[in-house]
Regions:
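Short, charge/polar-rich alpha-helical segments
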Residues: 41-67
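Extended, amphipathic, non-transmembrane alpha-helical segments
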Residues: 65-80
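Charged, long alpha-helical assembly modules
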Residues: 78-137
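Short, cationic interaction patches enriched in Lys/Arg with P/S/T/G and frequent prolines
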Residues: 1-46
C-alpha cells in the first residue's frame, strides 16, 4: 500500500480564503432570496414592467397637473398686468394665488424629477435581478 501525505494545514491560506468563502455564502443566500421572491427571470421582468408602467402613469398625471397649473399662472399674471395697466394696486388675494401657484409648480416639478429618478433606479435594480436570475436558470 502507498500512503499519500497530506499537505500541512496552512492557517494563513485558510484565513485569506475565509473572506472568499463568506462572500460566496452571502451570494448563495441572495440568490435563494431572489429565487423565492421571483422564481424566474420572466416573473421578475413582468414585475418590473408593471412597476415601470405605474411610474409612467404617475409621471403623466403629474405632467398634466403641471400644464394646468401653468395655465392658471398665465391667467393670474394677466390679471396682475390688468391691475398694473389700470394703475390699481394688486389685490393681496391675487398675490397669494400667484405665490401658492408658484409653490405648486415647484413641488410638481420636484415630484416629476423624483418619479423619473425612481423609474431609472427601478430599471437598473431589476436589470441586475433579471441578469442574476438568468444566470441561475
Amino acid at each position: 500500500q502507498i500512503i499519500k501525505r497530506n499537505k500541512s494545514f496552512n492557517s494563513e491560506l485558510d484565513q485569506s480564503q475565509s473572506h472568499i468563502r463568506a462572500q460566496q455564502a452571502r451570494q448563495r443566500e441572495q440568490d435563494m432570496k431572489l429565487k423565492r421572491a421571483y422564481g424566474t427571470s420572466k416573473t421578475a421582468a413582468m414585475k418590473r414592467d408593471e412597476l415601470l408602467k405605474n411610474y409612467n402613469k404617475q409621471i403623466a398625471l403629474q405632467q398634466r397637473q403641471l400644464k394646468q397649473i401653468q395655465k392658471d399662472r398665465i391667467m393670474f399674471k394677466r390679471q396682475e398686468m390688468e391691475h398694473f395697466r389700470k394703475g390699481q394696486a394688486i389685490p393681496n388675494d391675487l398675490k397669494d394665488r400667484l405665490n401658492y401657484n408658484m409653490q405648486n409648480i415647484t413641488n410638481i416639478k420636484k415630484n416629476i424629477e423624483s418619479l423619473q429618478s425612481d423609474y431609472r433606479n427601478t430599471q437598473t435594480q431589476y436589470a441586475t435581478i433579471i441578469n442574476r436570475l438568468e444566470t441561475l436558470e
